[in-house]
Amino acid sequence: NNFFQGYNLLFQHSLFASYMDWFHAFNCSLLLGVLVFVTLLFGYLIFSTFYFKSKKIEYQFGELLCSIFPTIILLMQMVPSLSLLYYYGLMNLDSNLTVKVTGHQWYWSYEYSDIPGLEFDSYMKSLDQLNLGEPRLLEVDNRCVIPCDTNIRFCITSADVIHAWALNSLSVKLDAMSGILSTFSYSFPMVGVFYGQCSEICGANHSFMPIALEVTLLDNFKSWCFGTME
């Protein structure tokens, strides 16, 4: 199963994304097993057709095998799939912090609904504003800061055209549409800064509305909240 772990995928930095990565590897392993089995089965059928062509033989065992094998494969896919759906449902039941994300042409606005007065706009930094080590076209003037090991509910919407709030390293992509509030919950087990971009073509400056999400310790998050509201 680990043969395909992380194959062609980014390293995932959240629990749910890690489970999805494992499920992808598990399915790839199953598909490889199915490919080998079907190849051997067809080889056996072709061989037996020519070898026993003068005899009348009923392939009852082969028919039974072709009925049981797909059923087992489907059950092996169903169990982890339902487990992931159940886990995702539990994540959406409870949250410790709600962050409202609004897409504009061409920047993002963040509002912490549980912390009165904490809201700001996030614009891409120009080249002359970048500090050493900050990525070009991805760094912003105000990052969205959240605490780690905390269940966060994100509410995504738009103030104008359709946008998409996407962070590939977290397996997050949700459309931001005017008049519609899309929600999802996430928990981040590790600290760090994660970058993304609007992945819906939204106008001339579509390529210049990046996303910067900073995950930090709870004490640092509290200090950041007080400092931002001053």
Swiss-Prot record:
Which residue ranges are assigned to the Mitochondrial matrix compartment in the record's topology? Answer: 51-63
Indicate the principal place this protein occupies in or around the cell: mitochondrion
InterPro entries given in the database record:
CcO_II, CcO_II-like_C, CcO_II_C, Copper_CuA, Cupredoxin, Cyt_c_oxidase_su2_TM_dom, Cyt_c_oxidase_su2_TM_sf
Query: What biological processes does GO assign it?
Result: ATP synthesis coupled electron transport
Can you state which reaction this protein catalyses? 4 Fe(II)-[cytochrome c] + O2 + 8 H(+)(in) = 4 Fe(III)-[cytochrome c] + 2 H2O + 4 H(+)(out)
What positions does the entry give for Cu cation A1 binding? H163, C198, C202, M209
Q: Which residues lie on this side of the membrane: Mitochondrial intermembrane?
A: 1-29, 85-230
Q: Which UniProt keywords apply?
A: Copper, Electron transport, Magnesium, Membrane, Metal-binding, Mitochondrion, Mitochondrion inner membrane, Respiratory chain, Translocase, Transmembrane, Transmembrane helix, Transport
EC assignment: the record states 7.1.1.9
GO cellular component terms attached to this protein's record: mitochondrial inner membrane
* Subunit-level organization: Component of the cytochrome c oxidase (complex IV, CIV), a multisubunit enzyme composed of a catalytic core of 3 subunits and several supernumerary subunits. The complex exists as a monomer or a dimer and forms supercomplexes (SCs) in the inner mitochondrial membrane with ubiquinol-cytochrome c oxidoreductase (cytochrome b-c1 complex, complex III, CIII).
Q: Would you tell me the protein name for this molecule?
A: Cytochrome c oxidase subunit 2
Q: Which organism is it from?
A: Caenorhabditis remanei (Caenorhabditis vulgaris)
> Taxonomy-wise, where does this protein's organism fall, top ranks first?
Eukaryota, Metazoa, Ecdysozoa, Nematoda, Chromadorea
